[in-house]
Amino acid sequence: MRSDIFGSRWCLLISVVMALLVVISLCAIACSAESSDLKILVVHSYHEDWGWNQDIQKGIIEGLSRQGYIEEQDYQIKTFYMDTKVTYVTPEQVEERGIKAIDLIRDYKPDLVFVNDDDALKYVAIAYIEKYPDENIPFVFSGTNLDPSIYAPINSLEKPGGTTTGALERFPFHDAFSLGKSIVPQATRIVLMADPSSSSTFVVSAFKERYLDKVSDSPLEIIGPIQVNTFDEWKAKIMEYQTEADLLGILTYHQLRDEEGNVVPAPEVVDWTVHNSDLPEIGILTFHAEDGFMAALGVSGYKTGIYIGILGGEILGGTSPGDIAIIDPKVTDIAFNLERASMLEIKIPNDELIKADVVFQTIGSSRY
């Protein structure tokens, strides 16, 4: 009899403990769901494998964490790639991709939207604000080469007003050319090469306006920038300037087309260039060195992402984006490719290696 009573009490105790565990689990799930109710959307202008996009995305998550917002715990994140550099390249296609992103915003109802590069700013953020002026979804942009105050919803860089702020992208050309001069002291001329994409046109225009027309102490004489449409034209120009320049400046190379009109994969462009040109290359984005060019000094995607992520955290905390000035955060990275330097029989100076943010040992990228 006594053992029966003991057994019954033991079963009751186990039942109570199990019930408590269930309640605790449900509370934990509920709390987790409640804490991650915030929804964030990131819209990239280009494709998923574009190195800049990957760096920006990682930086955003890091920047938000520095403001106390942890992915999955405090917010859910969704990403949309417009893919306007390789796949959807006509004006009509770019606009259609913008509409898809806007539809996603309507369905997802994010608390904050990050838009990366000029297409996403124009065709998503600005288009959304102009179409739905009474909504207050905040937008934070990055990778913007033009002056965003040309758009009506942005009053000025100092006081944007409305629901939009972000980071300008201003390439540090002078620093990049100085790096080239440091590595190859005898160099006096650099030829700049670019593909025909709209983003390249922005970069070329900005370079002429902000560098050629204003800088009087350039460490190198500039040839170009030269924009070419096809891979064959790229090859011809590269060979033409083997004796006319001392350095090759890499702006862009992702929309060169073959005889059939198809985009030539970037690794193919890099591979041909490094095996047929004797000009040391200086790129303007870190992943140019990762792909195989000798050196790069440019705006850091990761650090830019951290910057706008911190801005995003500030906005989630209650600050109006319209009160946050739009600036160039002036965050750069230096990168080298040692295999390419070895091919050119160039020794990267120790003081430059010390300053490098990343050094790649081999030619070739895993980002495509």
Residue ranges and their predicted role:
Residues R2-W10, A28-Y368:
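Short hydrophobic alpha-helices and adjacent helix-cap/hinge residues
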Residues S15-C27:
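Bacterial N-terminal signal peptides
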